[in-house]
Design a protein with these regions (language model features):
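Conserved short beta-strand edge segments in small beta-sheet-based binding/regulatory domains
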Residues: 68-80
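Short S/T/G/P-rich N-terminal loop/turn motif that feeds into the first structured element of a domain
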Residues: 1-35, 39-45, 53-57, 78-105
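Short, flexible active-site loop motifs that bind/organize anionic cofactors or intermediates
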Residues: 47-48, 74
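A short, polar/proline- and glycine-enriched secondary-structure boundary/capping micro-motif
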Residues: 15-16, 59, 70-73
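Functionalized membrane-embedded alpha-helices
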Residues: 48-50, 61
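Short, electropositive alpha-helical surface patch
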Residues: 57-64
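Conserved short hydrophobic interaction patches
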Residues: 24, 64-68
């Protein structure tokens, strides 16, 4: 599964977090894969895309790496737009006024 991890920097101060990344390094439990991250220009939030099959790995990661940084975390399960298109496709031809699928007969 994919998870969007939204990290909030305490007082918009990224220095403790980046110091943590540089000095002892960030560790990831086996099975948790970091895919990428994006930082807001004002240093308010960091958005990290992570992948794992067990959400407990995210809990382990937070506890092992972030307790002394002042960050808060929101972890949101997400689905790619390509996978969502597959789910939505069968419903695209429904007639909302008829309350079901369009009939061609």
């Amino acid at each position: 599964m994919l998870f969007m991890v939204i990290e909030r920097f305490k007082d918009r101060d990224p220095i403790p977090v980046y110091r943590r990344v540089r000095d002892p390094g960030i560790t990831f439990p086996e099975g948790l894969k970091y895919l990428g991250s994006w930082i807001e220009p004002n240093f308010d939030r960091c958005f990290q895309l992570m992948e794992c099959d067990d959400a407990r790995l995210l809990q382990q990661w937070v506890l092992a790496n972030a307790r002394d940084t002042g960050m808060t975390f929101e972890i949101v399960p997400v689905v790619t737009s390509a996978e969502t298109r597959e789910v939505v496709a069968p419903f695209l031809d429904e007639n909302p006024l008829a309350g079901g699928r369009c009939s061609t007969s």
